[in-house]
Amino acid sequence: MEKVIPVHLPHQSYAVVIASGGLGQMGDYLQHQAHLKPGQKVLVVSNPLIFKHYGEKVLVSLQRAGFATSTCLLPAGERYKTLKSVQQIYDCALEQRLERSSTILALGGGVIGDMAGFAAATWLRGINVVQVPTTLLAMVDAAIGGKTGVNHPQGKNLIGAFHQPRLVLIDPDTLKTLPGREFRAALAEVIKYGVIWDGNLFQKLEAAERLDQYRTLSPQLLADLLVHSCQAKVDVVTKDEKEAGLRAILNYGHTIGHGIESLTNYRKFNHGEAVGLGMVAVGQLAVDLGFWSQEECDRQFSLIQKAHLPTHIPADLDLNLLIDSLQTDKKVQAGQVRFIVPTAIGAVTITDQIPTPAIVHVLKQMQKG
């Protein structure tokens, strides 16, 4: 399959290309979709495991097309998403004498994409970045839209920049080597798109016999899942590139989810699992406060269960610290925490009128499981 989704922005337009076998044609895509020229330098940023699977295929294709290649390998995992890791990319960029016309190619999941994108945004005040996501989570979320950054000890993604890629190349074949837990976690973001934007996608997920493993998805469902999710992200980003308003809806489930991630030191739950927990919490909050029906909330809960995602939080998680952590969320305005709240399957609203006692009540219920 090959599907090209155009992203039209005021200052830079690009394509999201979904292509089976695309990694082996990387050089061609850089020339014809990213409009880069042979002879230019490309620094491939990855982690050792991903590079072991796909690095040679990418390098051979780039070299065959005439690009001057080099590599920078970083440790894998959210806890390495730091300025220290970005410094390693800077060191590689300096060693390879990257120029304004050079490109950083992010080959990996969301952590690699965020760090490589931030390095590209800040090296020489901005050079090209090409996003080549190899995880489902990065394919449907992190690689599209130009958000880049790293974590601060006090919160997730507090240091960053908007820096749009020259190209996003998604090769679904890389999902064959994705661990099952990572695949399931990414489904939280896919379900999110169904709740906030695309009711048709939500219904397709409901109709699927199983969602918990890559190999149980039909090729058609996988294609639908990728295309619908990417199109939803592109639709929102096109309307609001810098998160001035509408784009904030993409953070559904993230406000509480980021707090859970941070307070469990990014070790107990991965990002998608934490987002799923945030969706469970806000979904029930939306019922309690009259935003949507219990039936719609139950449909969301059932899909999250169908993806074999966690639905309860640890009994020993300090809820006072979790409530405090919400104040460091990027969506806080004038000291008020803004929540993305569902009003129907396929529609949400943004509100800062969520009483803290209501949040605590829902979280306590989630601890009882």
UniProtKB/Swiss-Prot annotation:
Molecular function in Gene Ontology: 3-dehydroquinate synthase activity; metal ion binding; nucleotide binding
Keyword check for Cell division: no
GO biological process terms, semicolon-separated: amino acid biosynthetic process; aromatic amino acid family biosynthetic process; chorismate biosynthetic process
Cofactor binding: number and manner: Binds 1 divalent metal cation per subunit. Can use either Co(2+) or Zn(2+).
InterPro entries: Dehydroquinate_synthase, DHQ_synth_AroB, DHQ_synth_fam, DHQS/DOIS_N, DHQS_C
Catalytic activity: 7-phospho-2-dehydro-3-deoxy-D-arabino-heptonate = 3-dehydroquinate + phosphate
Classification via Pfam families: DHQ_synthase (PF01761), DHQS_C (PF24621)
UniProt keyword list: Amino-acid biosynthesis, Aromatic amino acid biosynthesis, Cobalt, Cytoplasm, Lyase, Metal-binding, NAD, Nucleotide-binding, Zinc
Coiled coil: none
Top-level enzyme category: lyase
Location relative to the cell: Cytoplasm
Record's signal peptide: none
Binding site for NAD(+): 110-114, 134-135, 147, 156, 174-177
EC number(s) stated in the UniProt entry for this protein: 4.2.3.4
Metabolic or biological pathway, per its Swiss-Prot or TrEMBL entry: Metabolic intermediate biosynthesis; chorismate biosynthesis; chorismate from D-erythrose 4-phosphate and phosphoenolpyruvate: step 2/7
GO cellular component, one term: cytoplasm
Main localization (coarse): cytoplasm
Chain positions recorded as Zn(2+) binding sites: 189, 254, 271
Cofactor: Co(2+); Zn(2+); NAD(+)
NCBIfam families: aroB
Function summary: Catalyzes the conversion of 3-deoxy-D-arabino-heptulosonate 7-phosphate (DAHP) to dehydroquinate (DHQ).
Family matches, as PANTHER family: 3-DEHYDROQUINATE SYNTHASE, 3-DEHYDROQUINATE SYNTHASE, CHLOROPLASTIC
Family: Belongs to the sugar phosphate cyclases superfamily. Dehydroquinate synthase family.
Name of this chain's protein: 3-dehydroquinate synthase
Species the sequence originates in: Cyanothece sp. (strain PCC 7425 / ATCC 29141)
Gene name tied to this protein: aroB
